[in-house]
């Protein structure tokens, strides 16, 4: 979760409140089948074989749900889990505590460049899942993409799975209707969020501006998309 407190309609989200965070995580269970499918897609795009050793950072990692899946598929990977919420960092640490020395969970506020002080680049891979839409300012998001570019090593890949603005406002009700069935109550919760920072095409353009090449929208389904790009040469080993 990128910010400690965000406004969503009349609801005030407080990511420093453990009760709120645990309730939010509980509500995500309604989306378990979709989350598992999305995580599997992200993992399938990692350009590494199952036996490769590499370092990656999960940006706005939450409690580490994605990382459980990724580390199971890539057992030699080492992970940095970064989140702005101290509660999420605590829960992520507990998830892997004592059982997985490959993982470190750290706190960092993505609303400024201060998060860079909490991490130890370079990384071979950077990922984010359903989080960066909280950065509603396009300027800050473009800055963040440039910062992510800087923490990647040569040949590194960044992927962002997130909600993005519809190409046309007229399409939003249709996307909302189509996604409601798969996302259950969560779709109702965010139905008023019409102005995410950028369409998928705009995100791809911002990644290119940050230095990523090649870049692409790797996958899209209604308002969800995976956008990303490489830093330098593309090398696929798996």
PLM regions and their residue ranges:
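Short conserved loop adjoining the S-adenosyl-L-methionine
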Residues: 112-120
């Amino acid at each position: 979760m990128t910010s400690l407190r965000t406004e969503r309609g009349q609801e005030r989200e407080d990511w420093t409140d453990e009760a709120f965070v645990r309730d939010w995580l509980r509500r995500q269970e309604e989306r378990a089948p979709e989350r598992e499918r999305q995580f599997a897609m992200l993992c399938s795009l990692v350009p590494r074989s199952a036996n490769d050793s590499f370092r990656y950072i999960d940006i706005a990692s939450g409690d580490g749900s994605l990382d459980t899946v990724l580390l199971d598929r890539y057992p030699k990977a080492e992970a940095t889990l970064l989140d702005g919420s101290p509660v999420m960092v605590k829960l992520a640490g507990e998830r892997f505590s004592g059982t997985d020395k490959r993982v470190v969970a750290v706190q960092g506020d993505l609303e400024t460049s201060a998060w860079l002080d909490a991490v130890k680049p370079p990384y071979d891979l950077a990922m984010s899942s359903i989080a960066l839409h909280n950065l509603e300012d396009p300027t800050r998001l473009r800055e963040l993409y440039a910062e992510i570019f800087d923490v990647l090593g040569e040949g590194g890949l960044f992927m962002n799975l997130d909600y993005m603005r519809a190409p046309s406002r007229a399409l939003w009700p249709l996307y909302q209707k189509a996604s409601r069935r798969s996302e259950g109550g969560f779709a109702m919760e965010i139905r008023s969020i019409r102005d995410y920072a950028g369409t998928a095409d705009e995100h791809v353009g911002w990644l290119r501006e940050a230095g990523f090449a090649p870049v692409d929208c790797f996958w899209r389904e209604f308002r969800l998309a995976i956008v990303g790009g490489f830093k330098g040469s593309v090398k696929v080993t798996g």
